[in-house]
Amino acid sequence: MKDFETICVASGVQIVSAPANRFKTNEISISFCTPLSAKTASRNALCANLLARTTKKYPTLSEFNKKLAMLYGASVTCSVAKLGENQLLTLNASSLDDRFSFENDKISVDAFNLLMSMVFDANVDENGLFYPQDIDREKRLLAEKIESEENEKR
């Protein structure tokens, strides 16, 4: 394995990569670390979910999923975790390694660009706010997820 490579993409934002040719998939993650507070914890969880669903270029879930399908079935996930006194929000894209694509498609570049657009070109209105109907949907989905976890018998 090569040494880590670091690329600065914006002020305070760096990409650290560890190239390896032994895997059939690529994993690309973006993490945000924020102070944990009762006031912002649920908002941050909603924000991560909203970012992982659509972008300006792919404003509906259907269009977003179609783009993922075009990337040989790539997937995007988000997670929110407590890390000490901080909250860690992570967006992850998983895609087929370019070596396994037809006609030398650059799947990893497209997956990376999609991940970047989720953060830097989010599906927000002219005031930089998420659309109310999207917020309501994510609140409902998050509440359903929490309820199902509470009701799960282990």
Language-model segments: what does each one mean?
Residues 6-11, 54-56, 68-72:
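A short linear-motif detector with a strong N-terminal bias
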Residues 127-139, 154:
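Short, surface-exposed recognition loops or helix-turn segments adjacent to catalytic cores
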Residues 1-5, 51, 60-66:
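N-terminal start-of-chain detector that recognizes signal peptides
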Residues 18, 24-43, 61-117, 121, ...:
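M16 family metallopeptidases and their MPP-like homologs
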Residues 44-53:
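Active-site SXXK
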Residues 1-26:
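N- or domain-start disorder-to-order transition segments that initiate the globular core
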